[in-house]
UniProtKB/Swiss-Prot annotation:
There is a cross-link at residues 1-30 (Cyclopeptide (Gly-Asn)). The presence of a 'disulfide through disulfide knot' structurally defines this protein as a knottin. GO terms for biological process: defense response. Probably participates in a plant defense mechanism. Disulfide bonds join 4-21, 8-23, 13-28. This is Cycloviolacin-O1. It comes from the Eukaryota. Belongs to the cyclotide family. Bracelet subfamily. InterPro entries: Cyclotide, Cyclotide_bracelet_CS, Cyclotide_sf. Keywords: Disulfide bond, Knottin, Plant defense. This is a cyclic peptide. Expressed in leaves, petals, petioles and roots but not in runners (at protein level).
Length: 30
């Protein structure tokens, strides 16, 4: 996937989740 410039180590994907990104290997991917 495409990295969404947001990490999800301590908290889930927030802003980028609205753009269809999901957590994978502690990084939000689209």
């Amino acid at each position: 996937g495409i990295p969404c410039a947001e990490s999800c180590v301590y908290i889930p994907c927030t802003v980028t989740a609205l753009l269809g990104c999901s957590c994978s290997n502690r990084v939000c991917y689209n």
